[in-house]
Regions:
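Class I S-adenosyl-L-methionine
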Residues: 1-136, 140-142
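C-terminal target-recognition/interaction regions appended to catalytic cores
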Residues: 99-191
Length: 191
């Protein structure tokens, strides 16, 4: 959607006609929308988000946004999960707090098999450093990490959850971002 308000909304833009009308006509904004995929911008995550850009036409009255505004072209940087994973030397061999328990791992495997037998797609997802991308990091990740588990078979261990720093990197936070909170649960809830 560019320029003047249109009554037919494109199927790939999940925004109501009322919201578009309010932005473009009532508030006199030039508005454009686009769905962007995180993986196209260097984040190894299979996540799409709607971005909305708006400019006040009264404030920018001399600008023809239909011809001036251009969305940035995604660099389509080749990504892999290994780019955001901690160096194994930073995760102590004795520090297994990110490795899931045997009980949880057995439960994940059992539920995945049950759902597979029913024809459902539910189950944990296992990734390694060569994986091009992960699933979307959910708000409930702190509970069991099932949507993104890191394979540790080469270390003879059960899978592990991402560390909080890895979660920050996956979401595109810079290295300077301070990962801090009262508890591990609160840290994971930041992402």
């Amino acid at each position: 959607l560019r320029g003047e308000f249109e009554f037919e909304a494109p199927d790939d833009i999940p925004m109501s006609k009322e919201a578009r009308y309010a932005l473009s006509e009532k508030l006199n904004y030039w508005v454009d929308f686009k769905v962007l995929r995180a993986g196209d911008f260097g984040a190894p995550q299979n996540r799409e988000r709607v971005y909305i850009v708006g400019f006040d036409k009264d404030y920018f009255s001399c600008v023809d946004f239909d011809s001036e505004f251009q969305w940035p072209a995604p660099p389509k940087t080749k990504t892999r999960l290994g780019d955001i994973l901690e160096d194994l030397s930073n995760i102590s061999c004795s520090d297994d707090r990110y490795t899931i328990s045997e009980k949880l791992w057995n439960g994940h495997q059992r539920r995945k098999l049950e759902h597979k037998n029913k024809g459902n797609g539910f189950g944990y997802s296992l990734f390694n450093s060569d994986s091009e991308y992960t699933n979307t990091l959910s708000a409930r990740y702190y509970k069991d990490g099932s949507e993104i588990l890191i394979d540790q078979t080469e270390l003879g261990k059960r899978p592990r959850k991402l560390t909080p720093r890895e979660c920050a990197r996956l979401q595109g936070f810079p290295e300077e971002f301070i990962v801090d909170a009262v508890s591990q649960v609160q840290i994971y809830k930041q992402f």
